[in-house]
Amino acid sequence: MGAEVIKIEPPGGSQTRLRGPFTKDSDGKPRSLYWASYNSNKKGISLSLDTDEGRQIFLKLVNKSDAILESFQPGYLDSLNIGFETLAKINPKLVHTSMTPFGSTGPYAGFISTDLITSSMGGMPFVSGDEDRPPVRISFPQAELVAGSQAFGATVAALRHSRNSKTGQHVDVSEQIAVMWTLMNATPFPQLHGTDVTRAGAFRKRGPIDARHVFRCADGYVSMNAQAKTLDGFIGWMSEEIEIEKEILGFNIDKWNLKPDSDPNGKEASEFKKVEKAIESFLSIKTKMEIFERALSAGLLVAPCNTVEDIRKSPQLEARSFWIDVYHPEFGKDITHLGPYMKMSETPLKIYSPSPSVGSHNEEIFKSLGIGKSEIKALRKRGII
C-alpha cells in the first residue's frame, strides 16, 4: 500500500520462520513458505529488545516511524519500558497497534492463546460444521489473519487522524472480537429468538426445510443455491438426459408460502427432498467443470468447490494476472505468490521484493539512524543485532 514496512526479528530470527509448509533452499535446508508469503515487500532487521542497547536503537527507529504494529502479550513492552506511554513521549504522532488474543483489558487480557482457542472463544467453531456433530475448526488458522486485517484498517484510520491532528494513539485489537465480527447474523439470535443459531453444514434453511447446498459430483463437490431458477435449470437439464417423474418435472418451490414454523414433515418438504435426491443422483456422475459450464451458460447459481490446485489453474485468476513469480535468493528460484487482493487503476499494487532474510537490511536501516559500520559490527558481535 506504499508504506515502508520494517520487520523486526530477534537476532536468531522470528519463530514464524519455523511455521510450515517448507521447501528446500539453494543449500538444501528447509525454508518456510509461510514466512515467504506473509513478509514480501518488507525490509528486515534483527534487534534484541531484551538489551538496553537494543531498546535504544528501537527508540531511534520509533522516532522516525509513523506506526508500529506488534503482537506481544499485554504488558510485555511496558515491562521493557518501551510501551505506548513511553513511545508517545518520544513520538507524539505515533500510532501503536497491539494485536493480542483478548485485548489489553478485561479478565482474560493476560492469557496466552492459540488460534484454536481464540477462534473458539470468538464463536467461529460453534457455527461451523453439521448440527448433529461437534463444532469444527476451519482448517487453516483464521483468528490471527482476521485480527491482522482489522488491525490494518484501524491503523490506517488512526494514521489519518494522526496526520490531521498531530496526535497519535494506541489501537487495541482483540483476536476474540475480530473473530466475532465474522459471525454476521448469528450474534443477534439469542436476544431475538431466545436460542443460538444452529450449525447448518452443507445445508441452509428454506422455511422449515434443510436445503442441501453442497453436492458430491464425480470429481469433488459443487455448491448450489436452492432457489427456483437454479432448481428449474437442473430439472430441465435432467429431463434432457434421463426420464424423470412428472411430479419432479412440474416442481416449483416458489409456489409454496414457506415460513420458519411450517411443518418440516409436510407435503412441501417431502416433494422438495424427492427433487433434491434426484439432483444429487444426477450430479454424482458429472464432473465439476461439466456442472459449472452448464450453470454458466444457463445463469444458474452453482459453482465448484475448488481445491487449491483448481484455484491455481483458474482461468479467471489467470485473466487478471493474479499469480506473480518472485525470485527468492534463499531458494535460488522463482516462487509463485498470490498477487494483490485488489486492482488500483492509478497506483497498482505489486510485489517488488521477496521476504527478507534475517537482518538483511540491518546496515541500510541502522545507517539511517546514524549508526556507523564499525558500531554495527560491534553490535552484531555482542548479539544485539
Region locations from a protein language model:
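Substrate-binding/catalytic subdomain of NAD(P)-dependent oxidoreductase enzymes
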Residues: 159-203
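N-terminal helix-loop segment corresponding to the beta1-alpha1 unit
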Residues: 1-167, 198-199, 357, 363-385
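Short Gly/Pro-enriched turn/cap motifs at secondary-structure boundaries
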Residues: 35, 198-207, 212-213, 271, ...
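Aromatic-enriched alpha-helical interface/lid elements that frame and gate functional surfaces
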Residues: 211-298, 302
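Short, well-structured beta-strand/strand-turn elements
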Residues: 5, 296-310, 372-377
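Terminal low-complexity tails and localization/encapsulation signals of metabolic enzymes
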Residues: 216, 258-259, 310-385
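Mid-domain beta-loop-alpha active-site segment that forms a flexible
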Residues: 117, 141-156, 175-185, 210, ...
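A short glycine-threonine-serine/GTX helix/turn-capping micro-motif
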Residues: 135-146, 168-170, 202-203, 210-212, ...
